[in-house]
Curated annotation (Swiss-Prot):
The keyword Protein transport does not apply. Its main location: host cell. Belongs to the orthopoxvirus OPG132 family. Keywords: Host cytoplasm, Virion. Pfam families: Pox_A6 (PF04924). The gene is OPG132. This is Virion morphogenesis protein OPG132. InterPro entries: Poxvirus_A6. It is found in: Host cytoplasm; Virion. GO terms for cellular component: host cell cytoplasm; virion component. The N-terminal domain is not required for crescent formation but is required for virion formation. It comes from Vaccinia virus (strain Western Reserve). Lipid-bound viral membrane assembly protein that plays an essential role in immature virion (IV) to mature virion (MV) transition. Functions in both crescent-shaped viral membranes formation and its enclosure to form immature virions. In addition, participates in targeting mature virion proteins to sites of virion assembly to ensure their correct localization.
C-alpha cells in the first residue's frame, strides 16, 4: 500500500501540473481512497478493451489505456474538463517515459489491490468452514493421542478417512488455505489489508510448487533405510491415490509414501540416538533461553492455539530476529551434521550424493526473505 501511495502521489503531481498549465483551471483537493476506487473499476475494463495488464506490457498498450481514462472521474479533477490521461503524453521524452512507467506501475499495484480485496472477502466467507475443519482435526488428534495401541490409532484414522481425504483435497487445491487457517486465529488478517498482503507473500503456496516438491521428495534414494510397513504407512498408501493433486499430476503415491516413511524413520533415529543432533538441540535451547523472556510469555496468558498464534504474530519481528541469529550462528554445524547423516546412509538424488551445503545455501538465498 505504501508503494501504491507513492505511485499515486507521482501520478497526481504530474497530472495536476499538466492539467492546470493546459486549461488554466485549478485542481481540487486530493482523495486517494476515492480515486483508487475509480482505478479498481477501470482496471478490469482496460484489460477487456486493450489487453491483460502484466509487468511486461508494452508502452504503446499503456498509452492506449490512457486514452480510456478520463480525468473527470478522479476527485482532484472531477467534472472540470474532458481531458484524458493520454493528454499527458505531450510531455517531453524524459517526463513522458517516467509518466508511462508510473501509470503502468499504478495499474499493476491496483491489480494487486483488487486481488487482495477478493481474497479479503473470501477469507471472511471461508473462516467458518476452516473453524469447523480445525475443530474436527483437533478432535482426531486428541483421539490418536488417547489411543494405547497401533490398532486403536488405525481405527481412528479409518473412521475419519473421508474427512481426511476431503480436507487434504481442499488444502492442496487452494494455495491460500494456510493463509485462511492463520486468519482464523489472527484477526489482523481480516481487519488489516497491509497484514494480509504481508502474510500472502509468506504463506501462499502454489500447486506447481507443491507438485515440484513432492516429485523431488519421491525421487530421493534412501535405499539404506529399511521401509517400515506399519499400519500408519498402509493408511497413507491407501489414502494418497485418492488425493486429486496426485491424480491430476500423475504422481506415484506409493513411491512418495515409501520415501516419507523412510524419512520419518531416519529422523526418529537421529533424534533418539545421534549425539551430535542431541548436543545441537540442547545448545540451541539453552541459547534461546537467554534471549526469550519466559515471564513475558507467562504474563500473556497463552492457553490455546488462538492465543499462541496471536502472541507469535504480535512479536514476530522479535522472534524472527532470534531464530535468524540462532540459525546463522549454527549453519555450518547444521550442514556438517546433515552431510554426515547423508554420507552414512548414502542418500542420493538423481544418482548423486546429496550436497547439503549447496542445497541449504541455495534455499536460503532464494526463500529466506519469506521467513
Amino acid at each position: 500500500m505504501d508503494k501504491l501511495r507513492v505511485l499515486y502521489d507521482e501520478f497526481v503531481t504530474i497530472s495536476k501540473d499538466n492539467l492546470e498549465r493546459e486549461t488554466g483551471l485549478s485542481a481540487s483537493d486530493v482523495d486517494m481512497d476515492f480515486d483508487l476506487n475509480i482505478f479498481m473499476t477501470l482496471v478490469p475494463v482496460l484489460e477487456k478493451k486493450v489487453c491483460a495488464i502484466t509487468p511486461t506490457i508494452e508502452d504503446d498498450k499503456i498509452v492506449t489505456m490512457m486514452k480510456y481514462c478520463s480525468y473527470q472521474s478522479f476527485l482532484f479533477w472531477f467534472l472540470k474538463s474532458g481531458a484524458v490521461v493520454k493528454s499527458d503524453n505531450k510531455l517531453d521524452d524524459v517526463e513522458k517515459e517516467k509518466f508511462v512507467a508510473t501509470f503502468r506501475d499504478m495499474l499493476l499495484n491496483v491489480q494487486t489491490l483488487i486481488s487482495l480485496n477478493s481474497m479479503y472477502t473470501r477469507l471472511r466467507q471461508d473462516t467458518e468452514d476452516i473453524v469447523s475443519d480445525s475443530k474436527k482435526i483437533m478432535e482426531i488428534v486428541s483421539h490418536l493421542r488417547a489411543s494405547t495401541t497401533e490398532n486403536a490409532a488405525y481405527q481412528v484414522l479409518q473412521q475419519n478417512n473421508s474427512f481426511i481425504i476431503s480436507t487434504l483435497n481442499k488444502i492442496l487445491s487452494d494455495e491460500n488455505y494456510l493463509l485462511k487457517i492463520i486468519a482464523v486465529f489472527d484477526s489482523k488478517l481480516i481487519s488489516e489489508k497491509e497484514t494480509l498482503n504481508e502474510y500472502k507473500q509468506l504463506y501462499t503456496i502454489s500447486s506447481e510448487s507443491l507438485v515440484y516438491g513432492i516429485r523431488c521428495v519421491s525421487n530421493l534414494d534412501i535405499s539404506s533405510v529399511q521401509l517400515s510397513n506399519n499400519k500408519y504407512v498402509l493408511f497413507v498408501k491407501k489414502m494418497l491415490p485418492k488425493i486429486i493433486l496426485f491424480q491430476n499430476n500423475d504422481i506415484n503415491a506409493q513411491q512418495f509414501a515409501n520415501v516419507i516413511s523412510k524419512i520419518y524413520t531416519l529422523i526418529y533415529r537421529q533424534l533418539t540416538s545421534n549425539v551430535d543432533v542431541g548436543c545441537l538441540l540442547t545448545d540451541t535451547i539453552e541459547s534461546a533461553k537467554t534471549k526469550i523472556s519466559v515471564e513475558k510469555i507467562k504474563q500473556t496468558g497463552i492457553n490455546n492455539v488462538q492465543s499462541l498464534i496471536k502472541f507469535i504474530s504480535d512479536n514476530k519481528k522479535e522472534y524472527k530476529t532470534i531464530i535468524s541469529e540462532e540459525y546463522l550462528s549454527k549453519e555450518d554445524r547444521i550442514i556438517t551434521i546433515l552431510q554426515d547423516i547423508v554420507n552414512e546412509h548414502d542418500i542420493k538424488y538423481d544418482n548423486k550424493l546429496l550436497n547439503m551445503r549447496d542445497l541449504i545455501v541455495t534455499f536460503r538465498e532464494r526463500y529466506s526473505y519469506k521467513f
